Amino acid sequence: MEKLTIRDIDIKNKKVIMRVDFNVPLKDGKITDDTRIVEALPTIKYAIENNAVVILLSHLGRPKGERKPEFSLKPVSERLSELLGKQVTFVPELYGEEVKMAIDNAKPGDVILLENTRFDKGETKNDPELAKKWADLADIHVNDAFGTAHRAHASNVGISQYIPSVAGFLMEKEIKFLSKATLNPEKPYVVILGGAKVSDKIGVITNLLNKADKILIGGAMMFTFLKALGKNVGSSLVEEDKLDLAKRILEEAKEKGVEFVLPVDAVCAQKIESGVETKTFRINDGIPEGWMGLDIGPESIKLFKEKISGAKTIVWNGPMGVFEIEDFETGTKEVAISIAAETEKGATTVIGGGDSAAAIAKFNLKNKVSHVSTGGGASLEFLEGKELPGIASIASKKKIEN
C-alpha cells in the first residue's frame, strides 16, 4: 500500500519533527563526506518553504547511550547551515527546557537540530517515554531516514504511536525504486551480487530467485559457489560451512529456470595489497594454492556484460572485487559502466547501499543510474522481502472508495 508523504498533508505553519539520517563519516571533528546531509535537503527545504518549524533528529555512530563529544551533531549543524544558506539552531540536548525554549522562540521556516538521538539509551530500545517526549514537541512526524528503516527505534518508529508519521521525499524515492525492483520488476530482470560473504546475501538470493531471470555472482562470495562445484580456488576466501547451502542454491536456480552466472576467470594475487604481482587464472584450470582471487577476470567481464545487455530491470548489491585497490577495481568498474549503459537505454537500475554505492561514486556514475540507495542494511533487508519497521510505521494512503 502506498505511504502518505509530506506532500499529502498540510504542514503550513505547523511544527514538524523530522527523522533524517545524518550518520556521516567524521575525521578529527570534520565531515569527510556530506552525501547524507545533501540527500535530506529536498524534504527540509520543502518544510521551510511551507513555513513549518523544522525540528531535526538524527543519530551519528554508536555512542551506546552515552554522551560522547566525538559523536556530537554540532559539525553537522554547521555544514547544514552552509548548505541551506540559513542559520540552523543547534541544541545540544534531546528534550527538556532548552529544547522547548528553542522551539517556542522559533519563527516559521526556522530549522532546529537536536543532539545525537543515541546519546539516550532509550533510542535504540524504542522506549515509549522517549518517543512521547519527542512527539510532544511537534504536530507531525516526517520519516526521511531510510538508512535506519530496518531498525525499530524511538525516533523513527516509537514516535508514530503518538503523532502521525509520513514519508519524506528520500524515503518515498527509496520505497518507489526498491519496490519496483522487488515487487513488479520489468523483465528481463538481472540481479548482480558481490561482496565477501554468501551468508550476507542468502536472504536476497532466496527471495530474488523467485523473480529474477538471471543472477550474476562476483566478489569473494563467488569462491564458495565455485568450490561447491568442485573447482580449485586456491587460497581464495571460502565459507566452508556454506558449501552445502551454495549447492542447494545452485539446484534451486536450476529448478526455477533462473540463469545463475558464475565467473569463468579471476584476477589473483598472493597478498591483498597495491602494486603486487597479479595473475589471471581460468576457473576450469583452477587457482594454485597461495593465490587468491581478488577480482573477476577479463573473460568474466565480457560474459557479465553480455548477460546485463538488454535487461529492463537491474539490481546491483556488492562489488565484484577489492575495488578500493586499483589493481582489482576493473571488474566492479566495468559492471558499473554496463549498468549505466543499460540505464541510458531505458532500464530501471537500482544500486544497493554500502560498498556498491561507494563504488558507483568512485567511478563517477552516480547520476548515470536510476537510483543509488542510501541504506546498506536497510536496502539489503528490503531486497530480502522483509517488512521494515521504519516503513511499516509510516501512515498509508487510504483507499478512496467510489
UniProtKB/Swiss-Prot annotation:
<dbReference type="GO" id="GO:0005524">
    <property type="term" value="F:ATP binding"/>
</dbReference>
<comment type="subunit">
    <text>Monomer.</text>
</comment>
<feature type="binding site">
    <location>
        <position position="151"/>
    </location>
    <ligand>
        <name>substrate</name>
    </ligand>
</feature>
<feature type="binding site">
    <location>
        <begin position="353"/>
        <end position="356"/>
    </location>
    <ligand>
        <name>ATP</name>
    </ligand>
</feature>
<keyword id="KW-0324">Glycolysis</keyword>
<dbReference type="GO" id="GO:0006096">
    <property type="term" value="P:glycolytic process"/>
</dbReference>
<feature type="binding site">
    <location>
        <position position="36"/>
    </location>
    <ligand>
        <name>substrate</name>
    </ligand>
</feature>
<dbReference type="GO" id="GO:0004618">
    <property type="term" value="F:phosphoglycerate kinase activity"/>
</dbReference>
<keyword id="KW-0547">Nucleotide-binding</keyword>
<dbReference type="InterPro" id="IPR015911">
    <property type="entry name" value="Phosphoglycerate_kinase_CS"/>
</dbReference>
<keyword id="KW-0418">Kinase</keyword>
<feature type="binding site">
    <location>
        <position position="118"/>
    </location>
    <ligand>
        <name>substrate</name>
    </ligand>
</feature>
<dbReference type="InterPro" id="IPR036043">
    <property type="entry name" value="Phosphoglycerate_kinase_sf"/>
</dbReference>
<feature type="binding site">
    <location>
        <begin position="59"/>
        <end position="62"/>
    </location>
    <ligand>
        <name>substrate</name>
    </ligand>
</feature>
<keyword id="KW-0067">ATP-binding</keyword>
<keyword id="KW-0963">Cytoplasm</keyword>
<dbReference type="GO" id="GO:0006094">
    <property type="term" value="P:gluconeogenesis"/>
</dbReference>
<comment type="pathway">
    <text>Carbohydrate degradation; glycolysis; pyruvate from D-glyceraldehyde 3-phosphate: step 2/5.</text>
</comment>
<feature type="binding site">
    <location>
        <begin position="21"/>
        <end position="23"/>
    </location>
    <ligand>
        <name>substrate</name>
    </ligand>
</feature>
<dbReference type="GO" id="GO:0005829">
    <property type="term" value="C:cytosol"/>
</dbReference>
<feature type="binding site">
    <location>
        <position position="324"/>
    </location>
    <ligand>
        <name>ATP</name>
    </ligand>
</feature>
<comment type="similarity">
    <text>Belongs to the phosphoglycerate kinase family.</text>
</comment>
<dbReference type="InterPro" id="IPR001576">
    <property type="entry name" value="Phosphoglycerate_kinase"/>
</dbReference>
<keyword id="KW-0808">Transferase</keyword>
<dbReference type="InterPro" id="IPR015824">
    <property type="entry name" value="Phosphoglycerate_kinase_N"/>
</dbReference>
<feature type="binding site">
    <location>
        <position position="201"/>
    </location>
    <ligand>
        <name>ATP</name>
    </ligand>
</feature>
<feature type="binding site">
    <location>
        <position position="293"/>
    </location>
    <ligand>
        <name>ATP</name>
    </ligand>
</feature>
<dbReference type="GO" id="GO:0043531">
    <property type="term" value="F:ADP binding"/>
</dbReference>
<dbReference type="Pfam" id="PF00162">
    <property type="entry name" value="PGK"/>
</dbReference>
<protein>
    <recommendedName>
        <fullName>Phosphoglycerate kinase</fullName>
        <ecNumber>2.7.2.3</ecNumber>
    </recommendedName>
</protein>
